[in-house]
UniProtKB/Swiss-Prot annotation:
It is a multi-pass membrane protein. This is Somaliensene A/B synthase. PANTHER family: CHLOROPHYLL SYNTHASE, CHLOROPHYLL SYNTHASE, CHLOROPLASTIC. Its EC number is 4.2.3.216, 4.2.3.217. One of its GO terms (cellular component) is plasma membrane. The gene is stsC. Its main location: membrane. CDD domains: PT_UbiA_3 (cd13965).
């Protein structure tokens, strides 16, 4: 009996570990736009409200699980819809590499779509979990993902669903937190088309109406360059200046503004799939770095 119980326990743990590993394979390429920055904002809320260390640890752990499910729902739906494209462009993704079957991914998506809002309800952020699910359905099953405006709105409104939930896991959203959320929402909505520079040929082949295909690659690059060039002004005025003229705020202002200017130059001067992929990764890291800065600018 003891041996059977031990074997059962081992089987359960192996299954759990395998599911955690598979979920990581699905979400790892999106961690810089979801899991890492959102967890930073949870921690910023904890610092702002002066939570004791033990409560802070619980809030952060709760946030990590919430945003793991948050991005897992997106990546499961996204990779199921884009399977044929991924066979050509992204051979390491789980559905293409055989780490997960299509049927397994569909079952996982059903499970996540049930578990995610329930967990959101438990944490007191149900409205934001449901907003994210509505956006996901519109993006992957409602056609938003095939048009530049829908794609940008999905990313932009998704910032609201992400960051409002992150803060409310700890406390009600403050006016200062809303200032950050609104600023980043507008920024992401306007500039998210940088992701569509990476595979213009593939998007054209599948009939996707991305911004570079609708307005032209050159015009899109000029627009994005202008947006990133104006970035330092928005960063300073809306995110950094309200925190006061401390040296660490000035240093952060310079770093974030400098990275924004670097992106402005890259988007027009560094072209090609590999360069555009690198540019997009820098955008993701800029977003995470900005939200890491909220730890001491919103305290």
């Amino acid at each position: 009996m003891t041996t059977m119980t031990t074997n059962t326990r081992r089987t359960v743990w192996r299954t759990v570990w395998r599911e955690i590993h598979v979920s990581w394979l699905f979400i790892r390429s999106d961690r810089w736009t979801t899991l890492f920055p959102a967890t930073c904002f949870v921690l910023a809320a904890a610092v702002h409200t002066r939570l004791p260390p033990a409560e802070t640890a619980v809030a952060v752990a709760s946030g990590v699980l919430y945003f793991w499910l948050f991005v897992y729902e997106h990546t499961l739906a996204n990779q199921l819809v884009g399977l044929e494209e991924d066979r050509v462009n992204k051979p390491l993704r789980p559905l293409v590499s055989g780490r997960s079957s299509v049927r397994g991914a569909r079952l996982r998506l059903i499970a996540v779509r049930v578990a995610f809002p329930l967990y959101g309800w438990f944490l007191g952020v149900l409205e934001w979990a449901l907003l994210w699910q509505v956006l996901s359905l519109l993006q992957h099953e409602g056609g938003w993902g095939r048009h530049w405006l829908g794609r940008n709105l999905y990313a932009g409104i998704g910032v609201v669903a992400q960051l409002a939930a992150a803060w409310e896991i700890v406390a009600p959203v403050t006016p200062d937190a809303w200032r950050w959320i609104v600023t980043l929402t507008i920024t992401v909505t306007l500039l998210m088309s940088v992701q569509d520079l990476r595979d213009i040929t593939g998007d054209r082949a599948v009939g996707r109406s991305t911004m570079p295909l609708v307005f032209g690659e050159r015009n899109t690059r000029v627009f994005l360059c202008a947006g990133f060039a104006l970035g330092p002004l928005a960063i300073h005025h809306f995110l950094m200046a309200p925190a006061g003229p401390h040296w660490w705020i000035v240093a952060t202002d310079v770093v974030l503004g400098g990275l924004s200017l670097l992106l402005a130059f890259r988007v027009v001067l560094r072209r090609g799939q590999r360069s555009d992929q690198h540019t997009y990764r820098l955008v993701e890291q800029w977003y995470t770095l900005a939200l890491a800065a909220s730890l001491y600018t919103l305290r």
